[in-house]
Amino acid sequence: FDIETVKIMKNIADEYGILLKEHNCDYLNFNQISLRKKYGIDAINIAPELGVIQTNLIYTLSKYLKIDKEIEKFQKLVLKKNKWKKWNYNNENNFIKFLSAGHYHFNERLYKDIIFKINKKVDLQKMLNKNIENYLLRLFN
């Protein structure tokens, strides 16, 4: 995080009446986020981190609800598509690869079928909202 560069970029953004957003802010702690706010970053992108939260919740619920075959097929699909390479350079742990890349495949038919089966038994959206809320509360408190 280069404070001097951010100051210059913030001045330019303000001059044109636009907000300044930083990408790749996944897994920052409270102090790192506060520093960005202090120097004028208006928004941060943590979407991939939220994708990990959602993928983990889907995996956990699938195991709990005995949708094992489907989630294992989805996990294999995610690993096969290699999107995890963007996030995992030398990691050989397939579960971490799966968690980090699952969000790229939320539009797959297999994923939608899993969601349908989960929603028959629990309110997935409510659980996901609670998981994300808990994450944000931990981050900002």
Located regions from the model:
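Flexible, acidic glycine-rich loops studded with aromatic residues
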Residues: 14-141
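Alpha-helix-loop-beta-strand connector modules within alpha/beta enzyme cores
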Residues: 2-17
